[in-house]
Amino acid sequence: MGRIFLDHIGGTRLFSCANCDAILTNRSELISTRFTGATGRAFLFNKVVNLQYSEVQDRVMLTGRHMVRDVSCKNCNSKLGWIYEFATEDSQRYKEGRVILERALVRESEGFEEHVPSDNS
């Protein structure tokens, strides 16, 4: 097997895989904390890196029927949640392309402040 190359999304509050600590996303990508997964509380994120995706599955959830893919850590293969590919209800379309990470399967930690110089400095 070859090397695994991981992305780092940066940010002051980071979410990482609870099993291997691979960085997944940051707090600025967080959309909602009001979701529930198989292990309990779950968070909806706009952008998440370092994931592997399963085949598309048709699931009936509390909010209706969705086409989803399970997501797992690219580094250690631990299951982390799912990504919404398609929602049949118009009111649920905002979830499409967004990722659910189950709170019990990720760890939140301090990141770092990035100073990006402006053109004026």
Swiss-Prot record:
A Gene Ontology BP annotation from the UniProt entry: cell population proliferation
What GO CC annotations are associated with the protein?
centrosome; cytoplasm; midbody; mitotic spindle pole; nucleus
Concerning InterPro entries, the annotation shows: Yippee (IPR034751), Yippee/Mis18/Cereblon (IPR004910), Yippee_fam (IPR039058)
Sites bearing Phosphoserine, chain numbering:
S118
Ranges for the Yippee domain? 13-110
**Location within or outside the cell:** Nucleus; Cytoplasm, Cytoskeleton, Microtubule organizing center, Centrosome; Cytoplasm, Cytoskeleton, Spindle pole; Midbody
Q: Which UniProt keywords apply?
A: Cytoplasm, Cytoskeleton, Metal-binding, Nucleus, Phosphoprotein, Zinc
Q: Name one GO molecular function term.
A: metal ion binding
Q: Where does Zn(2+) bind?
A: C17, C20, C73, C76
Q: What does this protein do?
A: Component of the CTLH E3 ubiquitin-protein ligase complex that selectively accepts ubiquitin from UBE2H and mediates ubiquitination and subsequent proteasomal degradation of the transcription factor HBP1. Required for normal cell proliferation.
Its quaternary organisation is: Identified in the CTLH complex that contains GID4, RANBP9 and/or RANBP10, MKLN1, MAEA, RMND5A (or alternatively its paralog RMND5B), GID8, ARMC8, WDR26 and YPEL5. Within this complex, MAEA, RMND5A (or alternatively its paralog RMND5B), GID8, WDR26, and RANBP9 and/or RANBP10 form the catalytic core, while GID4, MKLN1, ARMC8 and YPEL5 have ancillary roles. Interacts with RANBP9 and RANBP10.
Q: What is this protein called?
A: Protein yippee-like 5
Q: Which gene encodes it?
A: YPEL5
